[in-house]
Amino acid sequence: TRFLPATKAQPKEMLPLVDKPIIQYAVEEVAASGIRKMVFITAQGKHSIENHFDSASELEKVLEGKGKTELLDKVRKTSELGKFFYVRQQQPPLGLGHAVLMAKELVSDDYFAVLLPDDVMDCQTPCLKQMIEVGEKKDAAVLAVQKTDEDGQKRYGIVKVEPTDDPRISK
């Protein structure tokens, strides 16, 4: 509801941040971290996410015909960021855990990452890649978290952490 009326007809994941939808930043981070298979758990009315990452042959023909090669490359690269799978969440939505569980058959026994494009991480080495490296080094699950104020504690999931010898890693 924070982004209404902008999200009445468009998913918040598709709201633009500079020149591309917010969700594309997350997908680019996943791709830059070496992951090719991406599963989107979507809800009713979010077909624009699928359309965005699908190839667009008609648009490509128009751009090619107009000699707009830079835009053509951007459009093509978007659909080449990974192999995309889409699962529609059942109604009513039953929370994040249920949404993740819906991808179980596609994920199988593989390691996986859950990204929510609510925050965009701007790191020289992608945040997800750093998390993968920590997970492999520690042989453990890894969460990216941030400090929040009292208001945020009412709106977000909260974790209690203990420091370790690495200032970037808490237990």
Regions found by a protein language model. Name each.
Residues T1-T69, F84, Q89-Q91, T125-Q130:
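N-terminal glycine-rich phosphate-binding loop and ensuing alpha1 helix
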Residues L59-V62, T69-D166:
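Conserved beta-loop-beta/alpha segment of the NTase-like Rossmann-fold superfamily
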Residues S170-K171:
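Conserved FAD/dinucleotide-binding core of flavoprotein oxidoreductases
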